[in-house]
């Protein structure tokens, strides 16, 4: 299965009648492996900050997390594994695997829990595959 198919079929799938606003699978260096049509382009320094927060949980909390210059308030995640952010009525979940970052961005009516479930399920599968 191609990386694009993972995004299209597993991240952009319908959950209780709702979809993520956008999603992607990125390398740890920010290289895009696959993305949905509306996925924002991360800046290199944003990826650097996200990777540092995985290594040093709490690093982004004082300043917030920036994604394509949009600021997200960092909310409780799983240290070293999942970073969650909130912005208005939406948010973001990023799950780190051995080689990738699985990213889901949502807006209402999708809930943070639904986004976490979609991103977490694919992230767990990639971890099981050694990726």
From Swiss-Prot:
Tell me the keywords, alphabetical order.
Actin-binding, Allergen, Cytoplasm, Cytoskeleton, Disulfide bond, Phosphoprotein
Q: Where are the transmembrane segments?
A: none
Name any GO cellular component annotation: cell cortex
Q: Where is this motif: Involved in PIP2 interaction?
A: 81-97
Per the record, the domain of life is Eukaryota
* Gene Ontology terms for molecular function: actin monomer binding
What positions are modified (Phosphothreonine)?
Answer: 111
The entry's comment on post-translational modification says:
Phosphorylated by MAP kinases.
Provide the primary localization. cytoplasm
- Give the UniProt subcellular location, in the record's own words: Cytoplasm, Cytoskeleton
Which residues form each disulfide bond in the chain?
13-115
Quaternary data? Occurs in many kinds of cells as a complex with monomeric actin in a 1:1 ratio.
Query: Its biological function?
Result: Binds to actin and affects the structure of the cytoskeleton. At high concentrations, profilin prevents the polymerization of actin, whereas it enhances it at low concentrations.
Q: Which family does it belong to?
A: Belongs to the profilin family.
Q: Which PANTHER family match?
A: PROFILIN
Q: What else is known?
A: The variability of the residues taking part of IgE-binding epitopes might be responsible of the difference in cross-reactivity among olive pollen cultivars, and between distantly related pollen species, leading to a variable range of allergy reactions among atopic patients.
Identify this protein by name: Profilin-6
In its UniProt entry, the species of origin is given as: Corylus avellana (European hazel)
């Amino acid at each position: 299965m191609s990386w694009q198919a993972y995004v299209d079929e597993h991240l952009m799938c319908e959950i209780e009648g709702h979809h993520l606003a956008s999603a992607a699978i990125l390398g740890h260096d920010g290289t895009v492996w696959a993305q949905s049509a509306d996925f924002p382009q991360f800046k290199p320094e944003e990826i650097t900050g996200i990777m540092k927060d995985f290594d040093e949980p709490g690093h982004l909390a004082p300043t917030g997390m920036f994604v394509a210059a949009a600021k997200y308030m960092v909310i409780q995640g799983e240290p070293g594994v999942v970073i969650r952010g909130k912005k208005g009525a939406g948010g973001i979940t990023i799950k780190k695997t051995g080689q990738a970052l699985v990213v889901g961005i949502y807006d209402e009516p999708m809930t943070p829990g639904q986004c976490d479930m979609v991103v977490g399920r694919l992230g767990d599968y990639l971890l099981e595959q050694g990726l």
